[in-house]
A protein has these predicted regions:
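Bacterial N-terminal signal peptides that target proteins for export
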Residues: 1-10
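Extracellular-facing/secreted segment signature in eukaryotic proteins
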Residues: 22-184
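Bacterial N-terminal signal peptides
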Residues: 9-19
């Protein structure tokens, strides 16, 4: 009798653990917006933003938050997958049409790579970042207000030096999922 109870408990615990692990691995996001051949999914977890970005490219995918003019003052994260290994960079829009590594400007890298894949001509990058870091090159993001989000992807080349093949700007409320295209 005790053996059956112990086996039943082990089965229940294993099922619960498998359910939890599969939920974590699927990395469900609360919201997602799509723009042409690109998507941006996100979830706010405390003071952290979890992001998933995908595009129909075998090159880089990127996102920027809250520019003041074109790309200026935006916090950018770009990523690609090469030979199965994902890589990201954290940059700051230091000019209307240019962004530079936070580290090179004297800041810190505050985006943390979660993972990335390149399958069927689609590159997907997942990362987390603080909503408010101590880095002056990472402007705070207010999840309750409107956030301007820049989405872009590059040509089929694993290099952060190539110019975007596609780009767009969206106005997003990160706490409700409401979004609309920004008129240019």
């Amino acid at each position: 009798m005790k053996t059956r109870i112990i086996i039943s408990l082990i089965v229940v615990v294993c099922v619960a653990l498998l359910s939890t692990v599969s939920g974590v691995n699927s990395a469900e996001y609360d919201y997602e917006v799509k723009a042409k051949k690109m998507s941006f999914g996100w979830k706010v977890v405390g003071d952290t933003l979890a992001v998933k970005m995908s595009a129909k490219t075998e090159g880089w995918v990127g996102i920027g938050f809250n520019p003041s003019k074109k790309m200026k003052d935006a916090n950018f994260v770009l990523g690609y997958v090469k030979k199965g290994e994902a890589k990201i960079i954290d940059e700051f829009g230091n000019e209307p049409t240019k962004h530079t590594s936070d580290k090179k400007l004297g800041g810190t890298v505050d985006a943390t790579l979660v993972g990335g894949t390149e399958e069927g001509g689609i590159t997907t990058i997942e990362f987390t970042m603080p909503l408010k870091s101590a880095d002056k090159y990472d402007p705070a993001i207010d999840v309750n207000g409107e956030t301007i989000v820049l989405l872009a992807y590059g040509p089929s080349r694993d290099s952060f030096k190539t110019k975007h093949k596609y780009r767009t700007a969206l106005k997003v409320n990160l706490s409700t999922g409401a979004s609309e295209a920004v008129k240019k």
